[in-house]
Amino acid sequence: VGNKMGQRRVLITDITETRFTNGLASIIEKKMNKLMHNIMQTCDYVIIPEIGDDRGNIRYVGPVVRQVSADRNTLRKRIGFRKNVILVTGGGTDAGKYLIQKAIEVHPSLQSKLDSELIIVPGPSLRLPDSREYRNLGFVNNMHDLIYAADLVISLAGRSTMDESMAYGTPGIFIPIKNHFEQEQGAARFGFKYEDIFRLAYLIEEKIGCRSNTMDMKGAARAAKIISMLM
């Protein structure tokens, strides 16, 4: 519609094609991917929230993440993080239940050695029983602050959690949902695959506390600037 009306157009997406299906269903998917590519070609700009090299009308602005509310030490005191914190999130749905259960299973054997505490954010749909083995935060609206304050993040390979972990310098273990192409592709960027869940204890020991430098967090500002140029 915008094309026919001669309006300026910007598409913001982190997926330029899908690979969910096989067999006959893949024929429909290929047509949808072709339609997506056609839409991209008719836009003035396609904004992708990843790190990459611009080409044609595609602009890579870097991760779009929320600004943390305080410095890391202040956040840890405010939240009550004293030990080495392993933050586990299931991504807000039951899909992450298997990952949370695995983290609960392996942590007791590591707790004394790592002086660690298991903090779980299962989200709104998954109910966990009370236990001395972990601290259950349920659903939170400041996940980005928790990620920044933690010493390790264990999560499904969801875009926002991975981007925030990378931007804030917090090490992460990202296990994709099996046969979910987008999550498998995202996890592979960090060197992980589904089978890594079976060596979770080893990965926790390897990754915890290995912080990296915080990254440029101006993806949203770059996207806004591109959009404003067309107004």
Model-predicted regions and their roles:
Residues 1-117, 125-231:
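Nucleotide-activated sugar donor-binding and catalytic core shared by glycosyltransferases
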